[in-house]
Amino acid sequence: MAKEIKFSEDARSAMLSGVDKLADTVKTTMGPKGRNVVLEQSYGTPTITNDGVTIAKSIELENQFENMGAKLVAEVASKTNDIAGDGTTTATVLTQAIVNAGMKNVTSGANPVGIRRGIDKATEVAVEALKKMSHDVKTKDDIEQIASISAANPEVGKLIADAMEKVGHDGVITIEDSRGVDTSVDVVEGMSFDRGYMSQYMVTDNDKMEADLDNPYILITDKKISNIQDILPLLQSVVQEGRALLIIADDITGEALPTLVLNKIRGTFNVVSVKAPGFGDRRKAQLQDIAVLTGGTVISDDLGMSLKDATVDQLGQANKVTVTKDTTTIVDGAGSKEAIQERVDQIKQEIAKSTSDFDKEKLQERLAKLSGGVAVVKVGAATETELKEKKYRIEDALNATRAAVQEGFVPGGGTALINVIPALDKIEADGDELTGINIVKAALEAPVRQIAENAGVEGSVIVNELKNEKEGIGYNAADGKFEDMIKAGIVDPTMVTRSALQNAASVSALLLTTEAVVADKPDPNANNQAPAAPQGGMGGMM
């Protein structure tokens, strides 16, 4: 396909237009007085949300050069969401501020490489200043405050705090639909381990890129599956019952994995395969833990068992299994309480006998997974649209809370970013490098300015007032007053604020140093071409 190329100012201005279109849409949601955005869906009802990354990912612009600029900002939001789980709107606002100021200077003749060095230096100093002002999460109230601010809902904050209290800071918390309109927290037996799906074609939810299996059978084996014939009798039995299947195996290689994926895509059955957790003897022990939890049997050479002879009775079962690219969570396994308790007691005895600190630590992890359970937040709402919006808020709140547990929290409402500006004044630089530092200093004001403007207040007035206040005093947009943000319970996770700034600075610096943009030239006849004939498919596996 022919390419269209733009250079220098033409390239940067086209991309800047895309950056602004996306950022202007996302930033309307910022702060306690932020608005919602309605997203059209290809099917079903529209989605109403204030979740920055969801909005950013849904935007496609007609002009391909503008679209590239928009996609780079969406990448900032997505990366921030991947690292910290929240802060996507802050990252977008910071990116827009840095890019706009940077483009003006580059257009005026400044050297973009010098500006980039200044941006990098300023970001490094700002991140260190954020870490120094960070406070550790110590109480249930701290967790409740962080979750409440992220979700803009005190009830959600209380739910998350209750869930974390029940399963611990490192415990597994999942989100499900409730059958009623109320939202509640239940603790069920379950566990999570660090292994994700073997193929992304196994996902059932393309937005979240995760696979959800309701009431599945679970095949647990320490064998390598390379021939589909080995598990064919078992697959046929599962298909006849109309149930989903989770396969936990040493590995699936050869033609076995493509065959499973092909049948999954065709809708023959719903299957997800993951590698067994752990290594060596620890792997065998963890597989046995999963078998006890789900009421299944480990199909193992050690026991003289064969996959060809395995029956449905030897499969484990669970109420629900969720698999992401990195983790597998089994909720409400079908194992008997007596068997689980017996296994727990056995692990406790092993801990008591062990003389190795490393072994004790690994045994404690197994014990926590087996006995800690999984907290399930059941989200209820009157309509499907409200349910989607509520789940987005709860997911953000949960992610923000986990981030705060890891790295602590700082004063919220953009206050921390204003408070780090004096640290940037101490950096020694000149010329274009100094310009880059000043660009970051100005950008650090943008989140507070946007929160104020969304609340109907002049942003510049609020920013100037905050610069004259002592550290920690911020603008509470919900009540329209200045106060100590930590005492008021308005806090942000340090990881969220840090990631937003680092990712915004990284992509902004790349945009400013862009000198040429290459895009596909639109084909004027594309809409007039007849659709391609459908391709023939392979026969079914069964």
Swiss-Prot record:
Reactions catalysed, as given in the entry: ATP + H2O + a folded polypeptide = ADP + phosphate + an unfolded polypeptide
**Annotated function:** Together with its co-chaperonin GroES, plays an essential role in assisting protein folding. The GroEL-GroES system forms a nano-cage that allows encapsulation of the non-native substrate proteins and provides a physical environment optimized to promote and accelerate protein folding.
Protein name per the record: Chaperonin GroEL
The biological processes this protein is annotated with in GO are: protein refolding
Cellular compartment(s): Cytoplasm
Organism for this UniProt entry: Limosilactobacillus reuteri (strain DSM 20016)
Name the keywords, alphabetized: ATP-binding, Chaperone, Cytoplasm, Isomerase, Nucleotide-binding
Cellular component annotations (GO), alphabetically ordered: cytoplasm
Q: What is its EC number?
A: 5.6.1.7
The UniProt subunit note reads as follows:
Forms a cylinder of 14 subunits composed of two heptameric rings stacked back-to-back. Interacts with the co-chaperonin GroES.
Q: Where is the composition biased (Low complexity)?
A: 524-535
Gene3D superfamilies attached to this UniProt entry? GroEL, GroEL-like equatorial domain, TCP-1-like chaperonin intermediate domain
Q: Which family does it belong to?
A: Belongs to the chaperonin (HSP60) family.
One Pfam match, given by its short name, reads Cpn60_TCP1
Q: Which InterPro entries match?
A: Chaperonin_Cpn60_CS (IPR018370), Cpn60/GroEL (IPR001844), Cpn60/GroEL/TCP-1 (IPR002423), GroEL-like_apical_dom_sf (IPR027409), GROEL-like_equatorial_sf (IPR027413), TCP-1-like_intermed_sf (IPR027410)
Q: Please give the residue ranges the record annotates as the region Disordered.
A: 521-542
Q: Which domain of life is it from?
A: Bacteria
Spell out the molecular function terms from Gene Ontology. Answer: ATP binding; ATP-dependent protein folding chaperone; isomerase activity; unfolded protein binding
User: So where does ATP get bound?
Assistant: T29, M30, G31, P32, D86, G87, T88, T89, T90, G413, N476, A477, A478, D492
